[in-house]
Regions:
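C-terminal accessory extensions appended to soluble enzyme cores
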Residues: 1-9, 255-347
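A generic structural signal for alpha->beta connector loops
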Residues: 75, 112, 155-157, 223, ...
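Amphipathic, non-transmembrane alpha-helical secondary structure
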Residues: 61-65, 93-104, 139, 143-146, ...
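Conserved, mostly hydrophobic/aromatic
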Residues: 81, 160, 240
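Structural recognition of alpha->loop->beta junctions
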Residues: 100-114, 173-190, 239-248
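Glycine/Thr-rich beta-alpha phosphate-binding loop at enzyme active sites
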Residues: 126-131, 157-233, 248-273
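Non-catalytic, usually N-terminal nucleic-acid engagement modules in DNA/RNA processing proteins
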Residues: 1-153, 282, 287, 295, ...
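Alpha-helical structural signal in soluble globular domains
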Residues: 148-152, 211-218, 239
Length: 347
């Protein structure tokens, strides 16, 4: 197999922001004006970047790979997740070589924007990892990364991942590693812990980006493109100069009766179900400004969609479509608002 060692990210556009709507969603829903629309239809219309785990969402991934090969100029980025967490949480062994074979098959690695490394989760699901397991996981992840880049057709599309709680020496290693052609790794994943409050994530991001800038300056390399795994906290995305973020919130929140709307750089989750009517986040208890923001999104979406129609939708399909459209309104108007030092090289 001949490998292509070119950097696929030279001179890529950073706008609109690559907010990746992970997950599939419903197939088709009848909108108030009679239009049939599924989540995939809206994603294609809005040119939403996509992310699917190869071992848990293979059908969706294969469908999108085929669509992008048939529509090469559609402007949609496809990201492949390793699914390592999914396998770990189910107690299944992860086969790195099977993952590599899948990436090389059907030209998926050619089509995709990037593919995540096979990162190693310490310990077993539901059991606290030992200190030895916690310290060994980043090294095993790095070994998997090195194994992968020697065996896929586009090595520079493999993204290594730095996790919250890991020693910063592992991030520095990613930033200073050079391929055999002398290039540095162009795209790096940053993964905060979802069980940590936002204030703690912000502290970690501050330190992480300081390490990125200090290290890049020291070795004389450009600031890498970065991806925030499992993060759609708007103020974090606006504060730090990442290239992309992914989350399934649009889908998961819809399933629990919630819609998402961005107000003053904050993502508000609004309960529009007939449960928890006294909850401060219920639509009945929202100020006029929030209701107006929801009405504005509905008006831009069109197809007769209104807040009342969303409330009356028992299946949650309207909520999912609203969430996709609402977050897209934010991403297409994205403005970096962070530290000037962090902004200078990327934004």
């Amino acid at each position: 197999m001949e490998q292509n060692w070119t950097n696929p990210y030279k001179n890529i556009s950073l706008t609109p922001y690559r907010l990746i709507a992970a997950g599939g969603g419903h197939s088709k829903a009848v909108l108030p004006d009679g239009t049939l629309m599924g989540a995939s239809d809206l994603k294609r219309q809005l040119k939403y970047p996509q992310l699917f785990a190869w071992n848990a969402e293979r059908k969706e991934l294969d469908n999108w790979n085929k669509y992008l090969q048939e529509n090469p100029g559609c402007g949609i980025d496809l990201v492949v997740d390793s699914g390592a967490y999914s396998a770990w949480s189910r107690g299944k062994l992860f086969d790195v070589d099977e993952y590599i074979d899948y990436l090389n098959a059907d030209k998926l690695i050619d089509t995709c924007f990037w593919a995540a490394e096979a990162d190693v989760i310490p310990g077993s699901y539901g059991v606290d990892p030992t200190e030895e397991e916690r310290l060994a996981a980043p090294q095993k992840s790095w070994e998997n990364y090195l194994h992968m880049i020697e065996r896929v057709r586009f090595p520079k599309k493999i993204v290594p991942i730095f996790h919250m709680g890991e020693d910063y020496k592992h991030l520095i290693r990613m930033l200073t590693y050079q391929f055999k052609d002398g290039d540095f790794i162009p795209y790096i994943g940053i993964s905060p812990r979802n069980d940590m409050p936002v204030v703690e994530k912000v502290k970690w991001y501050d330190r992480t980006w300081k390490v990125i800038y200090d290290t890049c300056k020291k070795v004389g390399r450009e600031i890498p493109l970065t991806h925030n795994f499992g993060c759609t906290t708007v103020n974090i995305m606006e504060q730090y100069p990442s290239c992309s973020s992914d989350s399934t919130r649009w889908l998961k929140y819809a399933a629990f009766g919630l819609i998402l709307v961005v107000v003053n750089s904050r993502t508000k989750s609004i309960n529009v179900s007939n449960r928890d009517l006294l909850n401060p986040n219920h639509i009945n208890n929202q100020p006029l400004s929030v209701r107006q923001a929801i009405d504005d999104v509905c008006a831009k979406f069109g197809h007769g969609l209104t807040l009342q129609k969303i409330v009356e939708d028992d299946k949650g399909d309207y909520r999912a479509l609203f969430n996709l459209f609402s977050l897209n309104e934010w991403r297409k108007d994205f403005k970096y608002a962070g530290t000037p030092e962090f902004k200078e090289d990327l934004w």
